[in-house]
Amino acid sequence: MKLPAAIKGATWLYDRVWLPIIPVLRRHRRLTDGFEQRLGNSLPRPADVWIQAASAGEAFLALELARTIQVRDRVSVLLSTHTKQGEEILRKHLPDGDSPAKQTPPEIAYFPLDRPSIMSSVVRAVGPRVMVLLETEIWPGHLLALKRSGCRILLLNGRLTPRSLTRYRLWPGLWRKLGPDEVLAVSPGDAGRFKTLFPDSVISTMPNMKFDRMAPPDSTASSTPAAELLPEAAPFIVLGSIRHEEERPTAAMISALLATVPGAVIGLFPRHLGRLGAWRTILARAGLRWRLRSELKHAVEAGAIILWDRFGELAGAYEAAEAAFIGGSLAPLGGQNFLEPLQYGIIPVIGPHWDNFKWVGPEVVAEGLLKVAANWQQAVDLLARAVAEKGSRAGVRAAARNYIDARRGGTRRACQSVLKYLKPVDRTEWGD
């Protein structure tokens, strides 16, 4: 691969910039695990396909893709991730006996630091025929090593925000030279942005692989802890995944909801439990009385606020709720997962900021499966209306299931693309 002199010089400089940075990173608590592997001192075994998943969410997608590929073809797979949480998910959900018969289980490793000399040694050791990058895993040292090795590069389930594109375009010539062979983006907008960044790559769209992972809730589950804490006939409103930047408007929402929906019980779920102390102060200053979830043994009184301080109970709260607001959306934070309430028959209400979930599609609003409020006041009106109307939960679940089912198939599409670069594919085995 012939590189322009400017890129060669920048690569040399980039490699040396890492020298003073590495000792600092070694002390970073999030990078301590697997640090020798990150340095390339513990090399993975060779693999035909290398799949990189940034963290926990992408780790599940990587597992699904690896399973599907190994069912279709006898190939060796390396799964890598940046985070300890991602590594734990990969190991937990892919035990030794999980691979198809006569297949070598995928190897799991931490993704190397992007120092070009480290990446070159790791790519030489692994020798992948196909590199799969999930969503937006774009690292110059990594891409350069892959290009020099002759490996085919695929970016699947691709997402690229306008803000990220602006940052990458500071040096458009670099990314044009390092572009993947093919990009499958999750929306036309993402595809257009990738085409701007990688004008020589093959760009198309695919269903988001995340739809393939969605499953209906267990209908045989027993009553949830949330249901046991509610007084009879009191409407229960969940405010889920509330972020730091939207605490004050959320407190205003709570006051307005208690005034608008008499007897309502509010379940307040901060996104980070480290904000519980701040919430105690905010609620006290607003003159609102609250109870900690961990201190409750019996049902609360009507009109109570439950400040949730336990992990793992948000889904059960949706099951018991009449209405739900999903945070990360009143401030420009990109939103949080609003799909889970739908699976329990609740049409979620969110604020105006949900860029991180636009991949779900604008049709989710058009089909009445998501209510988007312009501000916290409108969110209060929508939540109060949801409590008053008491729509059919079974109908919402069915509509949500149909919406999701119509958008499945991303994993299959991604697998087709990987196998296309490994060998000629008999397309009849995949169907139309």
Per-region residue spans from a language model:
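C-terminal amphipathic helix plus adjacent low-complexity
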Residues: 4, 22, 255, 391-432
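Short acidic active-site motifs
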Residues: 118, 142, 275, 313, ...
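Active-site and donor-binding regions of nucleotide-sugar-utilizing enzymes
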Residues: 25-42, 46-220, 238, 242-244, ...
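A transmembrane-helix-recognition feature enriched in membrane-embedded lipid enzymes
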Residues: 2-36
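Conserved sugar-transfer catalytic core signal across GT-A, GT-B, and GT-C glycosyltransferases
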Residues: 142, 246, 313, 336-337, ...
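Catalytic binding pocket for nucleotide-activated donors in carbohydrate/polymer assembly enzymes
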Residues: 180, 319-402
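Donor-nucleotide binding loops and adjacent catalytic segments primarily
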Residues: 68, 73-74, 80-83, 87-89, ...
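Acidic donor-binding loop of glycosyltransferase active sites
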Residues: 126-130, 301-333
